[in-house]
Design a protein with these regions (language model features):
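An N-terminal structural lobe/cap that precedes and organizes the functional/catalytic core
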Residues: 47-64
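Conserved short loop/turn motifs at secondary-structure junctions
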Residues: 49, 119-124, 256-260, 313
Length: 423
């Protein structure tokens, strides 16, 4: 199906990706900024590289609005003035926005004041973190080219095919947003998406909290006791050094070396150099001495200084309740056509069962939808029962069904979609 044929079925015109205008000077960028500021919303995507750097290197910005389609070259022109658009009331429409937000924050010093993420929103109407191509095929009835995923977007000039591929990432977003929003409105879920979008917008990203960097340490869970505290201190040092040198953390000290050093706890430079996974590349420019100092700092830290990715003092007596509630949440997600990971993660359930004051299930749209039901299930006022079709029903102890009322999206592209929570 051509772009023109697709456009006839939707209120938003679909641009031909080959018509994208190349913007590589201040005058062109200023013109784009003034034009986008007149719109209620614009579609945006970014291309970047970070294979050999800590911070993302922005290589291309794709922007579309109903009457315009541009590719901005941030290598040739400073993107900082685009901050005016980001700080305005014009809604930025992304697909899978998280990394784009990090890139824009690094390049412009801020993120959009208002945003809509088609991937996030689609999770509320029957999809599970869908790719852009999946949504385009389901909603727009078009197949996107997979393109060359290994493209070095920093190289110039880009080919015509590369430009068209990049532009195709934004040409459908405004139309898809309109379709998804209609379903959200009909199901009464628009406010839910607004709430989640604000959480996405304000989430800490980019420069990780150094004391929590060890959460990403591969096989870090095998460590125990003092070894864990050493690993935490090493990863915190590694994160700060990576930021300072603008290098990936693996270039500063690989995970294997962190694990080995945490267990061996060398006290001299010679012992450190002989530790598995450590070689001279990682000990230059004072790094070796800094590693020894990190080990020494860890020796003086109390056990309470350890930052845990998940509460380990979770009452073991509540573990059966965790399993039970998880099963019911999965059933509710299937019934309501919501991505189960949006309803509640394992950490969300643990936080709620522990009675944490800031538990996500106790507030916002989650609390309204299922907070009371989970409380009744855990307290024993309600129970789960198997139905003949294999589904789970939540019932009062009086054997009366306890229903969670929730409207369901009705569009064909939603109803025909595969179960987002199927195994």
């Amino acid at each position: 199906m051509s772009n023109t044929e697709t456009a006839s079925a939707f209120s938003h015109e679909i641009h031909d990706p080959s018509d994208a205008e190349w913007i590589n000077d201040e005058a062109g960028l200023a013109r784009v900024i003034e034009r986008v500021l007149l719109e209620p919303a614009y579609a945006i995507d970014t291309e970047f590289l970070r294979e050999r750097t800590y911070f993302p290197r922005l290589a291309l910005v794709q922007i579309a609005w109903p009457t315009g389609l541009v590719l901005i070259d941030p290598i040739a022109v400073d993107l900082a003035p685009f901050r005016r658009v980001l700080e305005s009331d014009v809604i930025a429409v992304f697909h899978a926005a998280d990394q784009d937000l990090e890139v824009l924050e690094y390049a412009c010093g801020t993120v959009p004041r208002r945003l809509f993420d088609t991937q996030l929103a689609a999770g509320f109407v029957g999809f599970s973190t869908p790719s852009l191509s999946t949504l385009a095929e389901r909603i727009m009835r078009v197949k996107l080219s997979k393109g060359d995923r290994l493209t070095d977007w920093t190289q110039r000039p880009l080919t015509t095919a590369q430009k068209s591929y990049a532009a195709s990432d934004v040409i459908y977003l405004l139309a898809m947003r309109a379709e998804i929003e209609a379903q959200l409105e009909s199901a009464g879920r628009s406010a839910w998406v607004e709430e989640e979008s604000e959480l996405l917008r304000t989430r800490a990203r980019g420069q990780s909290y150094a004391d929590k960097a060890w959460w990403r340490l591969k096989d870090g869970r095998v460590l125990r006791g003092r070894d864990r505290i050493v690993a935490q201190e090493l990863c915190a040092w590694r994160e700060r050094r990576a930021q300072q040198d603008d290098k990936p953390v693996r270039f500063v000290l690989p995970d294997l070396a962190v694990l080995s050093v945490a267990q061996a706890k060398p006290t001299t430079f010679a012992e450190l150099a002989a530790t598995r996974g450590v070689d001279g590349r990682y000990l230059k420019s004072g790094a070796g001495n800094e590693i020894i100092q990190a080990i020494e700092r860890a020796a003086d830290l109390p056990a309470a200084a350890l930052q845990l990715p998940e509460p380990e003092d979770f009452d073991k007596r509540l573990r059966p309740a965790l399993t039970l509630v998880s099963a019911w949440v999965s059933q509710l997600a299937r019934d309501a056509k919501i991505d189960a990971s949006l309803l509640a993660t394992r950490s969300d359930l643990i936080s709620f069962l522990r009675g944490d004051a800031d538990a996500r299930l106790a507030r916002g749209w989650r609390g309204t939808l299922m907070g009371d039901a989970v409380r009744q299930l855990v307290s024993g006022e309600a129970a789960l029962a198997f139905a003949r079709d294999g589904s789970l029903n939540l019932e009062h102890r009086s054997n009366q069904p306890l229903r969670v009322e929730v409207a369901v999206p009705t569009a064909d592209w939603v109803l025909d979609a595969p179960d987002p929570n199927a195994a």
